[in-house]
Regions:
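Catalytic center-proximal scaffold of phosphoryl-transfer enzymes
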Residues: 1-356
Length: 356
């Protein structure tokens, strides 16, 4: 019956909410236990982990609706979407790994490879292109799997009725795994192409210009700086054909530079920054880079911090919910979910008793 009152792992909502919150804000579960002890709140290390993972598991299995307000949608709003990848280390079992000679005790052997959490942001813009502070953003991520990331983003957008949005900007860096899926995902959801704008982050494009100019020979540093400034101005003003033509001449047929120029050829339709400014759209993907830093890096990229795939993904999800300002929405939805689940079970039991 404890679940009827919203309990998780025999913990009351206020307790498991606080435990779970500390688990994704603190650098480790040891620090969570230390804080609880300092505040004279009862807690045990194993139980703290179980509660945090249990909350993460329950919310994770209902992740699209658990952090949304009832009836939340983006109808008639200007929406910005952005995707990027971060880095975290995972604990992956390796039974073939040789044990350390300095460590004789028997324990499971594992590797700690770096993996890429792929995170997306959904936010609402004001008419002037600034972020609407009255709307809560949506952050979520999956580890490694680009298709899962795309499917998850599509799930959120479908729930938000993205096809009814007034305008949509999809902005990111030049990673092919992003752009291979971006437009097709939105079109499948019924989004009109006339509403959709795609853009490469301006500052990533500038980095590619700088990389190309840095490889030029027999040009001094001062002239290279002037060239970068000139080409940046062309890029900003939307003079892309002039920019590509100028860099092609500078390359003098060198294959290395011509290969780098393919970046601009492939993304020329996504670099119309003059048109973006006319429509009051941002030209940078700072919202997702900020989210990567706050959601992933500050908690899951620390030295010697690694866990198994499933647990890390659950904690990333909980941290994303908290940093999006949706924690209380999630907890209230979780209580209702537990209540509804138990009610359904009680009805089933009552029905079976009547039949017997």
């Amino acid at each position: 019956m404890l679940e009827y009152w919203g309990c998780v792992h025999k913990a009351a909502p206020a307790y498991y909410s606080y435990i779970s919150m500390l688990s994704i804000l603190c650098p480790s579960f040891d620090i969570v236990l230390q804080i609880l002890n300092d505040q004279h709140i009862q807690g045990e290390y194993k139980r703290i982990k179980k509660i945090a993972y249990n909350v993460g598991e329950t919310c994770f299995s209902n992740r699209i609706k658990i952090g949304l307000k009832q009836g939340e949608h983006v109808s008639g709003k200007r929406v910005i979407l952005s995707v990027d990848g971060g880095r975290t280390r995972l604990r992956e079992m390796n039974p073939h790994k040789k044990p350390s000679k300095s460590y004789k005790a028997k324990r499971a052997k594992f590797d700690t490879p770096w993996r890429e959490p792929k995170l997306f942001v959904i936010h609402v813009l004001n008419k002037d292109g600034s972020i609407n502070k009255h709307e809560l953003p949506i952050y979520d991520a999956v580890i490694n799997d680009a298709d899962r990331c795309s499917d998850l983003l599509a799930g959120y957008l479908k729930k938000l009725r993205i096809e009814t949005a007034a305008e949509i900007l999809f902005i990111a860096d030049g990673a092919e795994w992003i752009w291979n899926r971006a437009k097709s995902t939105l079109l499948k959801l019924g989004v009109s192409e006339t509403k959709l704008s795609e853009a490469i982050d301006y500052f990533h494009a500038v980095e590619h210009i700088s990389d190309i100019i840095s490889t030029l020979r027999k040009i001094d540093k001062q002239k290279k700086t002037a060239l970068v400034k000139e080409l940046k101005k062309m890029l900003w003003d939307g003079k892309l054909e002039q920019l590509i033509s100028k860099m092609t001449v500078l390359s003098k047929g060198r294959k290395l530079i011509l290969d780098k120029l393919n970046y601009f050829h492939k993304n020329i339709s996504r670099m119309k920054y003059d048109q973006l400014r006319q429509h009051n759209f941002p030209c940078g993907s700072g919202i997702v880079e900020s989210a990567i830093r706050r959601v992933i890096n500050l908690r899951f990229k620390s030295p010697s911090t690694f866990g198994n795939h499933d647990n890390v993904e659950k904690l990333i999800f909980l941290r994303a919910i908290f940093l999006a300002g949706r924690w209380n929405i999630m907890i209230n939805n979780l209580i209702k979910l537990n209540h509804k689940f138990l009610q359904q079970n009680l009805k089933l039991v009552s029905h079976l008793i009547i039949l017997n």
